[in-house]
Regions:
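Short beta-strand-to-loop junctions in surface cap/lid or active-site-entrance loops
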Residues: 60-72, 229-234
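Short beta-strand element of the alpha/beta-hydrolase
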Residues: 72-83
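Short amphipathic alpha-helix adjacent to the substrate-entry channel of hydrolases
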Residues: 90-110, 125
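Gly/Ser-rich "nucleophile elbow"/oxyanion-hole loop immediately N-terminal to the catalytic nucleophile
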Residues: 135-150
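Short beta-strand immediately N-terminal to the catalytic nucleophile in serine-hydrolase-like folds
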Residues: 150-152, 181
Length: 250
């Protein structure tokens, strides 16, 4: 197992010294504001990209493109993390910019509805609908439909996977690949990694469970999209797993 990066190790030490506070103890507004404030940890903002916020068919998107990009590009449809209850363009802007610059891809982030205001399957429906909208508008957006990747972190990883599975079931079109960044795939928090990494690494087992509880309050555990153990897509890449609670699923 790799050692923690120095700055992260310091944050973990401070978290433990503070008594391992849980996001469950915060009201939803404070929880969301804290997530926005944490965006400073992502470092400097990449400026060598073009950023456009657009609305298509009632859903908001942030389109981040390499400068002077012409013609259809490989495209990453991105779903932000936040335990289904927080996050958005403000929390992930730096990551989206960096991804577009470093990859040379067009990156299109989908803003989905959050719990507790909107519960399951609202976020999943928005994620799937967002992907379909992007593909329908591929030409004006400059999207190469043969090279679409679905990606997301944490709750967004869940949304990317379920969107791919829904597309497969519908038999319409498929993404070229998935990129799942420490995805939330176990709504029961019962896997080995939840047990071994569930207390000390800031994003705790209780924090994730509190997000699931707000998003899935009336969902039967037998529902096929109540992700516990699920078959991973054949062309799937997972990142950031060494100390994560979700490691057991990749």
């Amino acid at each position: 197992m790799m050692a923690l990066e120095q700055g992260i190790a310091r944050l973990v030490e401070e978290f433990i010294a503070a008594g391992r506070p849980s996001s469950r103890q915060q009201n939803i507004d404070d929880r969301r504001a804290g997530y926005v404030a944490s965006a400073v940890l992502a470092g400097e903002s990449e400026t060598r990209v073009q950023v456009d916020d657009i609305t298509l068919e009632g859903i908001n998107f942030r389109v981040v493109s390499p400068q002077n990009a012409a013609g259809p590009l490989p495209t990453v449809i991105y779903y932000h993390g936040g335990c289904f209850v927080s996050g958005g363009f403000a929390t992930h802007d730096k990551q989206l910019r960096q991804l577009a610059y470093e990859s040379g891809c067009r990156v299109i982030a989908v803003q989905y509805r959050l719990a507790p205001e909107q519960t399951f399957p609202a976020a999943h429906n928005d994620a799937e609908r967002g992907a379909q909208i992007i593909r329908r508008h591929a030409e004006p957006l400059g999207v190469d439909t043969s090279r679409i990747t679905l990606a997301g972190d944490s709750a967004g990883g869940n949304l990317a996977l379920v969107t791919a599975l829904r597309l497969k079931a519908a038999g319409t079109w498929l993404p070229a690949q998935l990129i799942l960044i420490y995805p939330m795939l176990d709504a029961t928090a019962a896997s080995a990694s939840y047990i071994s990494n569930g207390e000390d690494y800031i994003i705790t087992r209780d924090t994730l469970l509190s997000g699931y509880e707000m998003y899935l309050p009336a969902t039967e555990s037998a529902h096929p999209e109540y992700l516990h153990r699920i078959n991973i897509w054949p062309f799937t890449t997972g990142f950031g797993m060494s100390f994560k609670l979700m490691r057991s699923f990749m």
